[in-house]
């Protein structure tokens, strides 16, 4: 709750969500009020930014990418209802599709990684596969392209493709981070 007092509430929503179940009714009420305010602000800004993404101008691609980057911190905390989480993730994917169609070069490897992770969370494996493939096509020598595929195949239980991606990764001179190593250990 100290993060909230300092104003760093957007990255603390999961903690605020936990405080909703506090035995102290005042704490629970305060947490509910903050969470409701933050989520209402989030919904409003998403709608505002979404409308900017629909405007056909020279900033359209940047607006789409910025919306994805804006949505991700809230979506990754999974504080929305399941239905709204799914809807917002689909909207995130939709605006990234628009950016990709217009100028895929402006999409960074981290943005691909974010959308893949959110799609995995809602178990939309078909769309996640599409974005994993696009990330690999555009960033074939970047670790996140491989970790996205590894996470996808891990989530689907597809050992054959998981090990195929792992072998491809081994052939490259890419430093593997601890998260990827742990994923590989878990699946073996």
Residues covered by each model-derived region:
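Short coil turns that delineate tetratricopeptide repeat
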Residues: 58, 100-107, 139-141, 174-175
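Residue at a conserved register position within TPR or TPR-like alpha-solenoid repeats
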Residues: 3-4, 71, 78, 115, ...
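Structural register within alpha-helical repeat arrays
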Residues: 15, 67, 114-115, 149
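Amphipathic alpha-helical scaffolding segments comprising HEAT/armadillo-like alpha-solenoid repeats
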Residues: 9-20, 44-48, 129-131
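Amphipathic alpha-helical repeat scaffolds of TPR domains
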Residues: 29-36, 40, 56-79, 94, ...
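Structural detector for internal amphipathic alpha-helices that build alpha-solenoid repeat scaffolds
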Residues: 2-7, 18, 29-37
